[in-house]
């Protein structure tokens, strides 16, 4: 399975320290959304560390074989993104950087960002949003029936994919 870390979604300029990190599974378009304390590479690596602990090292490697990121400074620590927090000295994934200005390489981004913005309008201070609110948005997006999936949700399809990998 291939994962794409997309742009982080920033809160109110100059007001929000917090940001949202959105991971999209390419095949099913399932989203994993993290609220980060700030817009740094350390915060992104810590989010992947949490995800690896949640899934376990072996399952993480199967589900997140590759991760494509843009060239933002929050993704600068390629080594940190790739290294396992569980199995010291091993890689948990392979990171690729997409070409600058090639938004077609991350086409699902705009749709997901619009969906996020329906729940959290542009200019909102993310510092005031709770983890539960972010999780609720993630569940809403993943439960949304999509024409591209024959009106199945990304969440349903992702669950099927994960079962096959187990």
Predicted regions and their residues:
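Short, small-residue-biased leader/transition segments that mark boundaries at the very start
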Residues: 2-5
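Mobile genetic element proteins and their domesticated derivatives, centered on retroelements
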Residues: 7, 23, 29, 48, ...
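Short, flexible loop/turn motifs enriched in small residues
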Residues: 13-19
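Active-site beta-loop-alpha junctions of metal-dependent nucleic acid enzymes
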Residues: 16, 33-58
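Short small-residue beta-strand/loop micro-motif enriched in glycine and branched aliphatics
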Residues: 29-34, 122
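Acidic/histidine-rich, metal-coordinating catalytic segments
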Residues: 58-77, 100-101
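Short, surface-exposed basic-aromatic patches at helix termini and helix-loop junctions that form
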Residues: 81-91
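Charged alpha-helix within mobile-element recombinases
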Residues: 92-166
């Amino acid at each position: 399975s291939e994962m794409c870390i997309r742009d982080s979604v920033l809160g109110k300029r100059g007001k929000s320290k917090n940001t949202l990190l959105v991971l999209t599974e390419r095949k099913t378009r399932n989203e994993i959304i993290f609220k980060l304390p700030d817009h740094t590479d350390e915060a992104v690596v810590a989010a992947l560390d949490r995800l690896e602990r949640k899934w376990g090292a072996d399952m993480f490697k199967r589900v997140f074989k590759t991760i494509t990121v843009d060239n933002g400074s929050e993704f600068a620590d390629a080594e940190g993104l790739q290294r396992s927090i569980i199995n010291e000295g091993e890689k948990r994934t392979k990171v690729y950087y997409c070409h600058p200005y090639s938004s077609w390489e991350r086409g699902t981004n705009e749709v997901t960002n619009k969906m996020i913005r329906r729940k959290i309008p542009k200019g909102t201070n993310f510092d005031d949003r709770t983890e539960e609110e972010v999780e609720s948005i993630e569940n809403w997006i993943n439960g949304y029936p999509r024409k591209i999936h024959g009106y199945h949700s990304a969440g349903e399809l992702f669950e099927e994919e994960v079962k096959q990998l187990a």
